[in-house]
Amino acid sequence: MLDNNNFSVSSNENQQIILDGKATAANIKENLKARVARLRDAGIPVGLGTILVGEDPGSLKYVAGKHKDCTEVGIDSIRIDLPESASQEEVLDAVLGLNENPDCTGYIVQLPLPKHINQTEVISAIDPGKDADGLHPVNLGELVLHPHGDPGVPEPCTPKGIITLLRRYGIDLDGKNVCVIGRGVTVGRTIGLLLTRSDVNATVDLCHTGTVDLKDHVRRADVIVSCAGSAGLIKPDWLGDGADHNGVVLVDVGVSREVDAEIRGDFDRDCWTDPRVRAYTPNPGGVGPMTRVMLLENVVDMAERRL
């Protein structure tokens, strides 16, 4: 649970609460700095590794951001960059090298990988105890097997970050209807596992490209989490006002780039000022910073298990 001290809730001119991921992530980083310092005093190394294959501009920027975050909280960083032409064997060798590196507490393989690389094989080769993204099959299985309480494994960063952000702003999910749009492993499927744990206790409606009358599912929701990657998919006339008529909460995970290179989310921006909206995540500046800081938190959690 985040420290609520000295935190001010911001809102727009229509009094919707802006779920500020940047401010929340900064708050968490201050806590992580202290935890990292205690670990170092105990002689326990804290290091995050990254494996990047290719030169995708978005991936390069994201990986650079992760290493910058490490510097801010005192975590050592280990960066392995491979060319786009790297073979399956070369990628697996990099994975096995970090598995055996005592200075690497946890690490991630930046996704997506080039098409000629078997992504499932690469992720499965990660030591589950060093799986900073929480996407190894063993760790996902632990989430499935533990619907009550902490499974004791790294949790997927984006779902964990979303729930942390909502809790930080006092948004109670107990008994609420949450419509999740998108069934990918990194967000859609895995946030369903976290939302339905007994300590969160939400009801999840998981929608996807095969869902009939998506608008109707969205309208019934108290909270909408969209990770479809379809710019402006959700329009204001899709929104309801929540089961308790207290307004709906919008969580925008989608990232699309238009011809002007500006990031667009899954929600039409007119949704942000709709009177039925109680709170929303800006995009950018909402979910993204929370994903990155949860990666750091996973690494620190791993290191603390060595105490």
What label would you give each PLM region?
Residues 2-44:
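Positively charged, low-complexity intrinsically disordered leader regions
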Residues 45-54:
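Short beta-strand segments enriched in small/hydrophobic residues
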Residues 48, 70-84, 203-206:
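Short beta-strand elements in bilobed, periplasmic/extracellular small-molecule ligand-binding domains
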Residues 53-67, 151-251, 258-271, 275:
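Glycine-rich phosphate/diphosphate-binding loop of Rossmann-like nucleotide-binding domains
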Residues 90-102:
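Short, well-structured alpha-helical segments in soluble
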Residues 108-173, 178:
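Anion-binding alpha/beta catalytic cores of soluble intermediary-metabolism enzymes, centered on
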Residues 110-116, 230-232, 255-258, 285-286:
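Short glycine-rich anion-binding loops that position phosphate/pyrophosphate groups of nucleotides
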Residues 120-131, 140-144, 245-306:
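Rossmann-fold NAD(P)-binding glycine/threonine-rich loop
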